[in-house]
């Protein structure tokens, strides 16, 4: 579960390192985001000389959450951190690589490009 003011790891090679959720998109009163939901982030830390700068605002998709995800077969999946992948205006990933595992729920949310860039899908 990611809500406003949650800090997330940026799991791609755009140059951002840490981001803060400033809005959860979808619905008028939606308070928390799960894996596959789109959020608006503010970049809090960035790598020097990268295209993403500190203070910039972007859309991102949540790829990992510390809060467990319940699946239809009764199993639960959780990760060590909250992570996101920065998106462009067409909701495609801005980076060319995705670091770490991502949840299989991204397939259901139609983020196939993120799934194909990921090294591991759990």
Swiss-Prot record:
GO biological process, one term: translation
One GO CC term on file: cytosolic large ribosomal subunit
UniProt entry tagged with the keyword Lipid metabolism: no
Domain of life: Bacteria
SMART domains: Ribosomal_L14 (SM01374)
InterPro entries the record matches: Ribosomal_uL14, Ribosomal_uL14_bac-type, Ribosomal_uL14_CS, Ribosomal_uL14_sf
GO molecular function, one term: large ribosomal subunit rRNA binding
Zinc-finger in keyword set: no
Gene3D superfamilies: Ribosomal protein L14 (2.40.150.20)
Job description of the protein: Binds to 23S rRNA. Forms part of two intersubunit bridges in the 70S ribosome.
Quaternary structure and partners: Part of the 50S ribosomal subunit. Forms a cluster with proteins L3 and L19. In the 70S ribosome, L14 and L19 interact and together make contacts with the 16S rRNA in bridges B5 and B8.
Protein name (record): Large ribosomal subunit protein uL14
Protein source organism: Borrelia turicatae (strain 91E135)
